[in-house]
């Protein structure tokens, strides 16, 4: 699967429907069968395409929160998209660093999870987690961004009933070359022109291998 932004070279975020369909077909050629909307709800036309093409979707809410506006946006996404068969899970947010290690984060995740179930009791909720230990306690499915930021094995050992999905594992920051032996950034992707050193913690092949070896986790 992939995390995809509503963005494409030459057109920006105003992607024509035909180009959306082309992108999905290219992903299928790679063997891709899942799509996480990052980090906002997908355009309805793209969901229609995923329905037709058999792509599994994690549809993502833009911001975590329980004030009137936060809940209005969450409700709008669910009501609009809940009849799409491609949607398998709702993501209530992404990498809320300020909340992930707090009891407030746990309570917020629980509240959003229960609010989501008011409008769709058939699908689970997740949040893409960047390494915290508290917010994830309030989720139906625990989403882990980057295995190097999350002690996934020990978390599962301590919480055997957890349902786990790898929600994000790498970023395509390099230009053309992949380097694994740079002393300053061992095991990371480095731009071929060496003008930039993106702080990317992992490469996708390692993530694939990690989740493939663990039948209790998807990713």
Give each language-model segment a name:
Residues 62-63, 95-97, 121, 131, ...:
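Catalytic metal-binding/acid-base residues of hydrolase active sites
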Residues 23-24, 77-78, 130-131, 151-155, ...:
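Generic recognition of flexible, low-complexity loop/linker segments
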Residues 54-62, 141-148, 163-169:
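Short hydrophobic/aromatic-enriched beta-strand-loop microsegments
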Residues 33, 140, 219:
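Receiver (REC) domain switch/active-site residues of two-component response regulators
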Residues 86-90, 109-118, 125, 136, ...:
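Substrate-binding clefts and catalytic carboxylate motifs of secreted carbohydrate-active enzymes
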Residues 1-114, 125-126:
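Active-site-adjacent substrate/metal-binding segments within catalytic domains
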Residues 39-42, 130-131, 145-150:
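Short beta->alpha connector loops
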Residues 21, 71-75, 148-149, 201-205:
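Structural motif corresponding to alpha-helix initiation and N-cap regions
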């Amino acid at each position: 699967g992939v995390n995809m932004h509503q963005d494409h070279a030459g057109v920006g975020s105003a992607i024509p429907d035909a180009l959306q369909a082309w992108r999905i077909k290219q992903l299928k050629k790679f063997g891709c069968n899942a799509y996480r909307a990052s980090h906002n709800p997908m355009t309805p036309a793209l969901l229609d395409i995923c329905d037709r093409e058999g792509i599994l979707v994690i549809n993502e809410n833009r911001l975590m929160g329980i004030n009137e506006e936060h809940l209005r946006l969450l409700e709008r996404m669910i009501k609009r998209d809940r009849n799409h068969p491609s949607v398998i899970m709702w993501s209530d947010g992404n990498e809320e660093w300020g909340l992930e290690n707090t009891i407030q984060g746990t309570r917020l995740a629980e509240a959003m999870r229960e609010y989501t179930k008011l409008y769709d009791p058939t699908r689970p909720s997740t949040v893409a987690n960047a390494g915290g230990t508290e917010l994830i306690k309030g989720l139906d499915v625990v989403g882990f961004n980057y295995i190097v930021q999350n002690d996934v094995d020990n978390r599962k050992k301590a919480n055997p009933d957890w349902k786990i999905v790898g929600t994000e594992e790498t970023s395509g920051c390099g230009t053309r070359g992949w380097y694994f032996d740079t002393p300053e950034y061992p095991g990371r992707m480095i731009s071929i022109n060496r003008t930039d050193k993106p702080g990317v913690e992992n490469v996708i092949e390692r993530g694939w291998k990690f989740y493939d070896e663990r039948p209790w986790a998807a990713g």
